[in-house]
Structure formats: C-alpha cells, structure tokens
Amino acid sequence: MLPGSLELILNPLLTTLITGSVAIVALQPLGGAISEAIAHGASLAIDRGGLLVGAVLSGTFLPLVLTGLHQGLVPIHVELVQAHGYNALLPILSMAGVGQVGAAIAVLMKTRNARLKKVIKGALPVGLLGIGEPLIFGVTLPLGKPFLAACLGGAVGGALISYWKVATVITFGISGLPLALTIVTGKVMLYLLGYLVAVIAGFLFTWLLGFNDPEE
C-alpha cells in the first residue's frame, strides 16, 4: 500500500503510461496499415480513373479550400511519397488554382470596375505561384459564376494531368508554376501544357458564363 499523497500522484501516472504504451503497440500497426491502404487506394483511383478521376478531384478542390477540408489531404500526400516515391495527387489538385487564374484574367478583361481590376492585378501574380486565396475571396467567389468557371477550368486541367500520369516528388507545400520544378523527369512539359490548358479553360468558361459586373 502506498501513502495517500503518493498514490494520488502515481495512480494516474502509471495508468496513463500503461494504457498509452498498450495503445501505441496495438494501434500503431493498425494506423500504418490504414495509411498504406489509403495511399494505395488513391494511387489506384488515379491510375485507373484517368480523365474522370482527375476532373472530379481538381473540380471539387476549390470548395474544399473554402471549408479548410483540403488540410485533411496532407497525410495522403505524405503516404503517396513514402509508398511510391512520387505524388500523383498534388499536380492534379494544383490545376484548381490554375483554372482560377484563367477565370480572373477573363474578369479582368470584361469588368469596368476599377477597384476590381486593381484587386485582380494584385492577386494574379501570387495566383500564378499557386496561392489562390486572394483570387477566391477577392474575385471569383464574390462574383459567383467565375468561381464555378474556375472549378470547371481546373477540372479540365486536372483531367489531363491525371490522364498523362504527371507526378511530383514532394508531398505538399507549393503549387502553380513553381510546382513544375518538382515534377518527375519526362513529365515537366506535360505539366506546363496542362497548366496552359487549365488557364484557357477557366478563361473560356468565365467568358461564356459571364457575371454581373459590380458597380463602382
């Protein structure tokens, strides 16, 4: 029997140590197996899904960014690189931001609102570098239809990137044009071509769908 004061300290400590150790020993292999299964499933879906899977992944990525749910994909990026040595998911998802660049250029050419033009000119350079939030919250989302057009443009680019099996050697962190520096050998030009197509598609969808030009 331990003194009451000592028992008060040691009981919770020992309980935590024992249960924590058991949990690590029992659950760590299970967690590893689940992570590997997710990575394998993602790779299989991209490999076999081709155009359709690429379009769906990229076309729905901007709404995920709005809610912050895209952060949940980080472990998948990590597992893909660890399991295969490359990441085929990130180049697909990066096309979502590229489609938005095209949409923003279309808005820039059509709008007569000086303030909106100024916002776009300030946000486009970082958009090209893969930082999409200024364009989302400052341009496409408030206008409505350009946001949809950006998603559609990204879907077109993502479909091609998936079909061409473009992959990067990094887990996450950069997107847009800088991502081209990390693309696997032999796929860089295909990534840049997909980038160009996504910009054009985002531009055309925005031009066709139109938008209500805000008053000054």
Which residues does each PLM region occupy?
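Signature of multi-pass transmembrane helix bundles
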Residues: 1-60, 173-216
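Short hydrophobic alpha-helical membrane-embedded segments
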Residues: 69, 125-129, 171-172
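Transmembrane alpha-helical segments of multi-pass membrane transport proteins and ion-pumping complexes
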Residues: 12, 16-32, 62-71, 100-108, ...
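Long, highly hydrophobic alpha-helical transmembrane signal-anchor segments
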Residues: 54-75, 79, 88
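Transmembrane alpha-helical segments and their short flanking loops
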Residues: 76, 122, 134-216
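Helix-loop-helix junctions within the multi-pass membrane cores of secondary transporters/permeases
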Residues: 74-154
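Short, amphipathic, aromatic/basic-enriched membrane-interface segments that mark the entry/exit
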Residues: 42-47, 61-68, 90-91, 118-122, ...
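Short coil/turn residues that cap or connect secondary-structure elements
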Residues: 2, 26-30, 68, 85, ...
